[in-house]
Amino acid sequence: MTEKTSVRRSVLFVCTIVVCALWMGCHPASQGAKQADTFRDGATFEADGTAQVTRVVPMPSTVSPEAQKWLASLTQKSDAPQTLEQRRAGTDEWRKRQSAEARRLYPVNLEETTTAGVRTDILTPLDWPRANRERVLINLHGGGFNSDSGSLIEGVPICNLAKIKVVSVYYRLAPENPFPAAVDDVVAVYKELLKTYKPRNIGIFGTSAGATLTAEVAAQLARSGTPLPGALGLFSVHPDYSRPTDSQELFALDGLPGRLEPRDPSRPPEDAYAGNTDRHDPVLSPLFADLKGWPPSLLVTSTRDLLLSDTTMFHRALLRAGVDAQLVVYEALPHAFWYHYQLPETQEALGLMAKFFDDKVRR
């Protein structure tokens, strides 16, 4: 270590302590010893730049009262680790309840069918404008690639608000069917739709695993020379399986809502999906793909999303490639908050998503 580097780190450490001391002196918690213990904040830094942080994250006043109430409800301790079967059972139960709520709030027509041999739900608006009947959206649900956390939860509101047909795809899940099985399923559905719709009249979107799969499908289509769709919705996307990002270290996905908890380094959830594929494969990890010529893309995340870093990094990559890419970051909310319809922020986010597809998926 050079003397200059040592001095710089010493100054950084001293500044950190001074800032923390000033904050503690001004914060109401410093008025009592019990509160002071609760609100202690500080940081130290290791030689390699790793930060050891204890911090205060107050309830933000910058979100809606509904969001404040909801965030407060997420403070209970995590449940014990679940088996895959338990996770799927719990996710299915939650999804059924939330899907029923989606259809109550955003009525649509629903037809269960298969497309290109893949199970799909066909959603159509109750009041379907004739001008929109040449457009279609493909929805890819979230759920960590090993369960279904949002097929109707995501597709129903967008169908209702955008007044565009949505095909929700039940792609094969890991670990029984690792990469590229899910990509193959969606590509098959997309190619089937190309028999009826022009590429520019098709949009693809999803949340979390569904957003990642959306990007993977686009990368595979581009690599194979298949015409790309007219628009992509990448809502909390994970485009790089080769390394964890800063926000993944700060926040961990705990159940569906997410909480402020450290990532468990002993649990590599990507392995079951990625299998033996090279983590730098440009389809598995689209951050390494040639993004030139990709369609207009909307990326949505939030400041307590474990995929905040991933989403913003992919947005920058798209911009570098000259893609028309928009990024919207919501304040203080966790991963996939737009699954929770009671939040005003959810209503805004869903409206933005619907408007994006109405604007970008050509008639």
Regions found by a protein language model. Name each.
Residues 83-87:
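Accessory substrate-recognition/RNA-binding modules or partner subunits associated with SAM-dependent
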Residues 2-14:
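Bacterial N-terminal signal peptides that target proteins for export
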Residues 9-10, 28, 96:
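Positively charged, low-complexity intrinsically disordered regions
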